[in-house]
């Protein structure tokens, strides 16, 4: 799953490099490190959610399973919104701190701000994937991610080659493709007949449950960030 998600940025880089130019390629590449860090951290929290959900499922405790599922999604929404605001507001400062070359900085800022504008979809997908894995549906989450990866490549050609939108087009394509995987996985969970069934009105933070999920997932998230860095 991590490899497929990293392919978003890889596909953007290849198509931008071939059809826009070397500076645009460098701009997309400069944005890769913080994006990989984000993917790793959100997947770590998703692992924590999956562990907690699977424990309650194994114990046959449907009430706690439902609470864990809906708390996990609430964590994802909060984290996604915080990352959106932080990424859009601080994207330029982050790239400057990473010593991004001046000649590619403007394009890099455009790419990373648009990417973080849609990062909520990626974070929510990662959390739903953790829930699906806990429920024994890991193959389905990978299929949804594969569909999103194909969508990203198609939209890259539409926005970059067809509409000549440059790095902005690449970032928009990535956001829309992540929306695809997010919607597909949420739709499946909303139609599920087991304890992992999602009801949008039930998504809320239960403090004790949120603390448990974060305690389990945080070490993995930090480890993933270190590996990605």
PLM feature segments, named:
Residues 1-51, 115-122, 211-229:
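Transmembrane helix-bundle signature of multi-pass secondary active exporters and lipid flippases
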Residues 2, 14, 18, 51, ...:
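Transmembrane alpha-helix boundary and packing residues in multipass membrane permease domains
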Residues 7-10, 19-22, 56-59, 134-135, ...:
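Helix-loop interface residues and adjacent transmembrane-helix termini in multi-pass membrane transporters
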Residues 13, 25-85, 122-141:
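Small-residue-rich hydrophobic transmembrane alpha-helices
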Residues 37, 152-157, 182-186:
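Hydrophobic transmembrane alpha-helices of multi-pass small-molecule transporters
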Residues 44, 85, 149-153, 179:
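Hydrophobic/small/kink-forming positions within alpha-helical transmembrane segments
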Residues 53-120, 162-218:
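Short alpha-helical transmembrane segments in multi-pass integral membrane proteins
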Residues 76, 131-155, 172-175:
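Alpha-helical transmembrane segments of multi-pass membrane transporters/permeases
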